[in-house]
Amino acid sequence: MEIKKGTWIIKKGFAEMFKGGVIMDVTSAEQAKIAEEAGAVAVMALERVPADIRKEGGVARMASIAKIREIMEAVSIPVMAKVRIGHIAEAKILEELGVDFIDESEVLTPADDRFHINKHEFKVPFVCGARDLGEALRRIAEGAAMIRTKGEAGTGNVVEAVKHMRRVMEQIKQVTKMEDEELVAYGKEIGAPVELLREVKRLGRLPVVNFAAGGVATPADAALMMMLGADGVFVGSGIFKSKDPRKMAKAMVLAVTYWDNPRILLKISEDIGEPMRGLDVEELEVRMQERGW
């Protein structure tokens, strides 16, 4: 267990390097290069962006090895890739391929309706989505080195990401005021290990990096998530479904860097072209955020 714990600390440290940055979904070597040139701290290699997964339906699986390898060979920044929730074999394949990070993602069709992957068994670090503190701490207990809001991917609508980030931050604030016996009871209530709740109380935050994701479509959206306490931002469909991906990618990076400077935010929000068309979350037939437990 000590070896696993030590390895987790190293994985967690790797994720810390992404703080204050943008991680972009890409589906080709060309898109990966655009992301790198714009200043992305990493890219997420995909066959289809979430908006297309949502539109086309069917079973969404790990991207093809050829696609991921093409993207890995195109850039020098870290490359992440998604696996289905609970799909141990997909994760082992990606680890063997040499990706830098794995996202056990609700954007893909879950492979296991009872268990997430035991991430301690892998050398490669994992990022997982969460809607609240209980979900975040369950994933960390399984070995996740990084957390992100689930939001509602592929919608271009930031409302769910805002809801999830606010909920986590509010719950953390509550935890910092609790006595130990209250932490024990709260851990049972939200399904979280009390040891991790004690760590949250001590730190006043999650014990790992916490990014925003799901529905970020404009530089203003990205800045908003930073204002709410995110350590950085994942942008999925928002860049390459916009009218001018190069401009949008650069603007997203600048917005995350200068989130607390309205003058700069105004400047970078001008002349970036049309953002992706958004969807009303209330009208969705499939809510990806509800996948996972």
From Swiss-Prot:
Q: Where does D-ribose 5-phosphate bind?
A: D25, G154, G215, G236, S237
Q: Name one GO molecular function term.
A: amine-lyase activity
Q: Which Gene3D superfamilies match?
A: Aldolase class I (3.20.20.70)
**Entry annotated with the keyword Lyase:** yes
* Record: residues binding D-ribulose 5-phosphate: D103
Q: In which pathway does it act?
A: Cofactor biosynthesis; pyridoxal 5'-phosphate biosynthesis
UniProt KW Transferase keyword: no
CDD domains per the record? Answer: pdxS
* Disulfide bond annotation, renumbered to this chain: none
Q: Which UniProt keywords apply?
A: Lyase, Pyridoxal phosphate, Schiff base
- Chain positions recorded as D-glyceraldehyde 3-phosphate binding sites: R166
Which transformation does this protein catalyse, written as a reaction?
A: aldehydo-D-ribose 5-phosphate + D-glyceraldehyde 3-phosphate + L-glutamine = pyridoxal 5'-phosphate + L-glutamate + phosphate + 3 H2O + H(+)
Q: Name one Pfam family in it.
A: SOR_SNZ
- Biological processes annotated in GO: amino acid metabolic process; pyridoxal phosphate biosynthetic process; pyridoxine biosynthetic process
Q: What is its EC number?
A: 4.3.3.6
* Active-site residues annotated for this sequence: K82 (schiff-base intermediate with d-ribose 5-phosphate)
Q: What does this protein do?
A: Catalyzes the formation of pyridoxal 5'-phosphate from ribose 5-phosphate (RBP), glyceraldehyde 3-phosphate (G3P) and ammonia. The ammonia is provided by the PdxT subunit. Can also use ribulose 5-phosphate and dihydroxyacetone phosphate as substrates, resulting from enzyme-catalyzed isomerization of RBP and G3P, respectively.
Question: What does the subunit section of this Swiss-Prot or TrEMBL entry state?
Answer: Homohexamer and homododecamer. In the presence of PdxT, forms a dodecamer of heterodimers.
**Family, per entry:** Belongs to the PdxS/SNZ family.
Looking up HAMAP family in the UniProt record yields: PdxS (MF_01824)
Q: What name does this protein carry? A: Pyridoxal 5'-phosphate synthase subunit PdxS
Gene this chain is encoded by? pdxS
